[in-house]
């Protein structure tokens, strides 16, 4: 174990204080280091669309002050006496959840992200009764079960988006048996998750169609990301010509939208996989699924096991996420740009390089 007791350490993070979502420096104490805990110095943290939802209370359950960030890469600086998986100096990652009951069916099946008692990386309450705070901060304390090793060959800033966006697209492709080469897949929405969907699906040997509401992303989808086709959803002729052509659609859109136009694109037995966090009901008429034995389903991030898999997959395939690295003092501007879809394709905050302790008020 390292010589610093994390329970005595006061750190600085950037927190939202209310539903305006504005972040500013905030000091707080790390929780006491448990026997199986890992203390990490945060190096980088990705910015996810969920951070917008949470900081602005779009889902109605936000608690303040809130330090967001759940795509966290850091260096281990201390370990509890029963930690066996990690050592001081390891570069590791932490994703969306930091706790679960370990006793329910999902936990026993190693899909702990579906545990009804899971503990979120931030905006939640830990087992000690204290609020969890995320990766827009100097340090974190996390149970070793919810920590993954960043493999050699993957830069830490590149690894950050894979801990949420990367595993979010990998998990349903694996679970629903959609990893077979030659499948025809659609990626609806070309943001942080969608761009990884294109890359992962292409690396599995799929024919990939990007679906977007306008033609403005065609060049980046096909020339930069390597998509095979581009479909403008507002063009009725294009949509009609593409009916019954796709084995699956990964729907990453995080706002309310119609489902029926996309169900029509699926072949018989095709799957529409919902991934966007949407706080309003979505609707469709039942014949749209009945007459093709189609499935509307959902998938939520991925397990710790799948996170480790997608990190190795990206190293093996030479995949990287397309990121814009920013400093901590750019956080609010980055969130504003994310809200208006002005990023290609993921912001990653250089936490360690931001000297955040100097900004504490």
Swiss-Prot record:
Keywords from the named record: Lignin biosynthesis, Metal-binding, NADP, Oxidoreductase, Zinc
Cross-referenced SMART domains: PKS_ER (SM00829)
List of residues binding Zn(2+) 2: 101, 104, 107, 115
Binding site for Zn(2+) 1: 48, 70-71, 164
Enzyme class, spelled out: oxidoreductase
Pathway: Aromatic compound metabolism; phenylpropanoid biosynthesis
EC number from the UniProt entry: 1.1.1.195
SUPFAM superfamilies attached to this UniProt entry: GroES-like (SSF50129), NAD(P)-binding Rossmann-fold domains (SSF51735)
GO terms, biological process: lignin biosynthetic process
Cofactor mode of binding and number, as noted: Binds 2 Zn(2+) ions per subunit.
Similarity annotation: Belongs to the zinc-containing alcohol dehydrogenase family.
Quaternary context: Homodimer.
Function: Involved in lignin biosynthesis. Catalyzes the final step specific for the production of lignin monomers. Catalyzes the NADPH-dependent reduction of coniferaldehyde, 5-hydroxyconiferaldehyde, sinapaldehyde, 4-coumaraldehyde and caffeyl aldehyde to their respective alcohols.
Protein name: Probable cinnamyl alcohol dehydrogenase
């Amino acid at each position: 174990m390292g010589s610093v007791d994390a329970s005595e350490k006061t750190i600085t993070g950037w927190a939202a204080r209310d539903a305006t979502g504005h972040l500013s420096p905030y000091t707080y104490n790390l929780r006491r280091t448990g026997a199986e805990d890992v203390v990490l110095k945060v190096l980088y943290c990705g910015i996810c669309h969920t951070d917008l939802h949470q900081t602005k209370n779009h889902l109605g359950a936000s608690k303040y002050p809130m330090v967001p960030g759940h795509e966290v890469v850091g260096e281990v600086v201390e370990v509890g006496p029963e930690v066996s998986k990690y050592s001081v100096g390891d570069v590791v990652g932490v994703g969306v959840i930091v706790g679960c009951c370990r006793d329910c069916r999902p936990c026993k099946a190693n899909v702990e992200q579906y545990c009804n008692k899971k503990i979120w990386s931030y905006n939640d309450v830990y087992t000690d009764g204290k609020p969890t705070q995320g990766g827009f901060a100097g340090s974190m304390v996390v149970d070793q079960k919810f920590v993954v090793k960043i493999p050699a060959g993957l830069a830490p800033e590149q690894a950050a988006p894979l801990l949420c966006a990367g595993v979010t697209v990998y998990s349903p492709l694996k679970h629903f048996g959609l990893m077979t080469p030659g499948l025809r897949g659609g990626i609806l929405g070309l943001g942080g998750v969608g761009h990884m969907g294109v890359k992962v699906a292409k690396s599995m040997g799929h024919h990939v169609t990007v679906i977007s509401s306008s033609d403005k992303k065609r060049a980046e989808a096909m020339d930069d990301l390597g998509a095979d086709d581009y479909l403008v959803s507002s063009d009725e002729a294009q949509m009609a010509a593409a009916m019954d052509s796709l084995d699956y659609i990964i729907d990453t859109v995080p706002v309310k939208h119609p489902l029926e136009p996309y169900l029509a694109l699926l072949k018989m037995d095709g799957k529409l996989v919902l991934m966007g966090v949407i706080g309003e009901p979505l609707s469709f008429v039942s014949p749209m699924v009945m007459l093709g034995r189609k499935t509307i389903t959902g998938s939520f991030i991925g397990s710790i096991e799948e996170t480790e898999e997608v990190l190795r997959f990206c190293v093996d395939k030479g995949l990287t996420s397309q990121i814009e690295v920013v400093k901590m003092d750019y956080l609010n501007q980055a969130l504003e740009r994310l809200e208006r879809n002005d990023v290609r394709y993921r912001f990653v905050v250089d936490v360690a390089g931001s000297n955040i302790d100097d900004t504490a008020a």
